[in-house]
Amino acid sequence: MECDGGVHAKNCIDQSGTKFADRLEHSLEIGAKKSGANRGEIHCNKYVLEVISDNDQLRMLEQYAIDYAHSIGLVSPISDPPDGKLTNIYAVPPPIALFPSPFPRELYDHAVNVQQAMNELYFRVASDHDFLMDAFKDVIKGDPFMARFVQIAKMVHDEGIHQPLAVQLQRADYMAHWDPSADGGGTMALKQVEVNIGAIGGPGFARTVSKLHKKVLDKLAIEHGGQPAILANSEAPVNRSRQNIAYALYQSWKLFGDPKAVLLCLSTMDSTHFEQLQFVQFEVEKLGKQQGDLVNVLVLPLTDASKRISLNETGDFSLYLDGTKRVALVHITDGNVPEEFPTEHEWTARTMIERSNAILSPNIRFHLSCTKKIQQPGMVERFFPDDPKRVALIRSTFTGLWGLEFEDEATREVIEDAIRSPGNYILKSQVEGGLGIFFDHQMAQMLQQMSKEERGAYILQRRINPLVNYLMRQKIPALLEDVVSEIGIYGSMIGDQSNGRILHNAFDGHVVRSKRSDVSHGGMSCGGGLIDSLLLFPMAQMLDKSKSALNEC
């Protein structure tokens, strides 16, 4: 919801004589009812409404944040430059929140504590060839793109894997789920949205947005003559995502054992991936220099790489760039959706990379391990048969999920319920980046029209009832909007898939992506989200605010 005035100020009266904050909050509540309250969304801590005194202060903070963003490199090439060519000559701050989103401290701690178990789960999944082939046997009937990935994985397995070491960079995405039916009138729980491996957008911007928000809150404290009382129990968590993930890549490069070999980053050269180039190229080179290594990081789109790489098939299966540069590590963020494979040349290049002895981040087995069917009953137990505590820790973050490849009564019932009540479910394909997710009436229509074979490429997931935060979104002028925040927890792992030995397993930081509560697709690559950060509050404070907001609505 757009607004042309400041936010909550107890002594600020508008021209009609009504307190401006009361008028603004009332309009937001009306908008909330229209935009999603019927889906079970619940409004939470409204600290933003308490910390801005008037419109002049809001505009000052907006310009202050923009200026500071430029000073710390929180910028990205604009998507529509004046000359029509995407270039880093024209740079502006990306879509960012002016203030950090409130989030329950207990749920954040839960997400951090489960991350190393999540890393190991997907390492074990990616190392189980038979499981992957079985998991995708129905998917490939209705998804030709994933069928090509499965075909490559089978080819590499049958030929013999030439590089047992593998790198997993993971981002596990969560929301704070509101369950109104729980004892005591409702409670919050951490629920997983999805897991991404390899193309994990956000780590480059995540740290700088946290830095910007700290600066804005410091400026507010100066304006207030001290920290506002409503922020007394808040805490901004430390975020070193860029450095930690770069460390995992640097260590992987070192493990290859050739100091002259290059690190090849496959990445599209557009604005949404600019921050990934920042942390890969600059941070890895910086780490190498500190350790006495000269790491040559080269960035290419998959299409360009397909014309310049070659494989030594008669020797040790080394991968070369331009015939002379041996490749130690390939970090793959390009080639995750069909549009990034316009010709057979891209498929040939990806196959060549998978057959090589270069260490991959990730290899194709990790790409397949992101099947959303891992949440189905019995799957986690398969990979941790003797560790019920770890199984329970992981499963505590799952929401309801159903595979659609069967023709049994249970499958028919859940499909019929999703068609009747589409607001309670999400239909997901195996495509990453938020592009294979379907909602509401589009989902219901697809379920009615798909054949059994087509359904096998999808899963149904219970829709999460998120917390909706009142937040300033940086635009010109700034807007006050209802937003839903999704927290991404980063983790990294290096392991030997031939024997299961783990060499590195770490929690690496977090990113927050927020979107308007009335927007379904919120990924940065989809253009619907903005970069955010966290301000942690005790759950009791969040719950008190949530319950009072629910009563008001």
Where are these regions (language model features)?
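Preference for protein termini
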Residues: M1-C553
